[in-house]
Amino acid sequence: MEFKVIAEYFDKLEKISSRLQLTALLADLLSKSDKAIIDKVVYIIQGKLWPDFLGYPELGIGEKFLIKAISIATNTDENSVENLYKSIGDLGEVARRLKSKQQSTGILGFLGTSSKESLKVDKVYSTLSKVALTTGEGSRDLKIRLLAGLLKKADPLEAKFLVRFVEGRLRVGIGDATVLDAMAIAFGGGQSASEIVERAYNLRADLGNIAKIIVEKGIEALKTLKPEVGIPIRPMLAERLSNPEEILKKVGGSALVDYKYDGERAQIHKKDDKIFIFSRRLENITSQYPDVVEYISKYTEGKEFIIEGEIVAVDPESGEIRSFQELMHRKRKSDIYEAIKEYPVNVFLFDLMYYEDVDYTTKPLEVRRKLLESIVKPNDYVKIAHHIQVNNVEDLKSFFYRAISEGGEGVMVKAIGKDAIYQAGARGWLWIKLKRDYQSEMADTVDLVVVGGFYGKGKRGGKISSLLMAAYNPKTDTFESVCKVASGFSDEQLDELQKKLMEIKRDIKHPRVNSKMEPDIWVEPVYVAEIIGAEITISPLHTCCQDVVEKDAGLSIRFPRFIRWRDDKSPEDATTTDEILEMYNKQPKKKIESPPIDESV
């Protein structure tokens, strides 16, 4: 299969904003792809070489490396490449223009390369894999030579998307949900197969693997798919409410209630003597927690399992729970064994999804919890999350206050009974978060996605000082603007912000972003931040839940304030538009709706 086919489809996809059109075009690409390499095609569409959970290196190629490779491939002086890049702001477009110029002036033939020698997807994939995996002395020069070699063989359009792929900035506006729908259309006979494909992806979060199974065995093979140790399950997510009475009513009057710990959610896999730890974002974080690997090996029973819990920093002297920030300090230390001494951790387990070749995601919570408790040996490091069973509001409140007093964020209220399955990859009312209230503020924080930035004035002139934030709409796979955040940042964070956003800056709005407000710069929807505010209000400036509460208006957050970055969350893990609407409906209503803030100031 020629890489040109993918490049041509990427070129079309980049110009489309309609999700339906994106999906149809993507389905067409998948149906025309070589089935023998369908997994690689899917990974390339996702903008990666392999799933994050494998823990393999990313391409990690900086601008200077790419400029050098483009310079060699197009026989252009490096300074000229750099100047063109400064003028255009897109290295992919720089590569396209220089390759076009090279072809038109006949230099290509002079250099001994032939446009008839087409670039194959297999060749692109194997070469880029070598670039990613090459380390040690001389690796820099080898990486540049390998990239330059690919670019020499590429036509202008191929060069554009090769460079963007290596940068990690394809800019074609495709999320995993769109890929899933396209796979259902291409291989499953239509949109009706989406649920089958989505269920399989939720149990095995590897789109390339799912595509390979479909083309080799058919869509029916996905129906019997079970979790597999080493491939993470997409985590079950909770809804949120701030009223204990309503929560208990939602779950049917009785529930299992766990402490909600302020740590890092972890999915732990074991097969024989091998143990893997995956983050909430399904990244392989095993190397960050050698102590947890040791604890699981020592204090759990079973040859093969997938369990879930929270890794929490604890005080080395008292054993008391420390904050999430303490855990982040540990992750920033270069010497992991020194970090283990300074920031020890405990693991609080709360679920079991797979055990000894049996899929437990379809079994009730009480069955899963009972088995989980039976495989943990008595010890001081790996424990079952502190929990009780409640059937009245008083007990729920009492346990909630106890959780807060002992350093927790609140509690997780979980439905029990035969229907209380593990809903992989889904957010629903089987689990409900009850977190502490914030005085004079919203009942809970929200996690929003950065989609744009605004330049400051005065001493912050010319630098980003506020952010356009959006909530995720899973129904449309888009990000809808909610607020503009300008407070809560330290000077150090603002300086860091400038660098972060410049790396993901876009010339135009991302196809998955829905916003009336025009920021000074648009960015890729990559970063997630935790935000608090005074209340949720109706606003004509924002698109979150537009026309749902009031015609021509959406919902916004009044007096939003930045709390922290949520590096553990992907953009699709952000607070949903439905959750924002639910929070709006639950907050005490004033006689007159708060006027929208003029966010242009």
From Swiss-Prot:
GO biological process: cell division; DNA biosynthetic process; DNA recombination; DNA repair; lagging strand elongation
Enzyme Commission no: 6.5.1.1
Enzyme class: ligase
Entry annotation: catalytic residues: K260
Keyword ATP-binding tagged: yes
Catalytic reaction(s) noted: ATP + (deoxyribonucleotide)n-3'-hydroxyl + 5'-phospho-(deoxyribonucleotide)m = (deoxyribonucleotide)n+m + AMP + diphosphate
GO MF terms held by the record: ATP binding; DNA binding; DNA ligase (ATP) activity; metal ion binding
Disordered: annotated segments: 568-601
Cofactors (names): Mg(2+)
InterPro entries: ATP-dep_DNA_ligase, DNA_ligae_ATP-dep_bac/arc, DNA_ligase_ATP-dep, DNA_ligase_ATP-dep_C, DNA_ligase_ATP-dep_cent, DNA_ligase_ATP-dep_CS, DNA_ligase_ATP-dep_N, DNA_ligase_N_sf
Chain positions recorded as ATP binding sites: D258, R265, R280, E310, F350, R427, K433
Domain of life: Archaea
Keywords carried by this UniProt record: ATP-binding, Cell cycle, Cell division, DNA damage, DNA recombination, DNA repair, DNA replication, Ligase, Magnesium, Metal-binding, Nucleotide-binding
The keyword Repressor appears for this protein: no
Cited CDD domains: Adenylation_DNA_ligase_Arch_LigB, OBF_DNA_ligase_I
A Pfam family recorded for this sequence: DNA_ligase_A_N
Family indicated by similarity: Belongs to the ATP-dependent DNA ligase family.
Function: DNA ligase that seals nicks in double-stranded DNA during DNA replication, DNA recombination and DNA repair.
Protein name, entry field: DNA ligase
Species of origin: Saccharolobus islandicus (strain Y.N.15.51 / Yellowstone #2) (Sulfolobus islandicus)
The encoding gene: lig
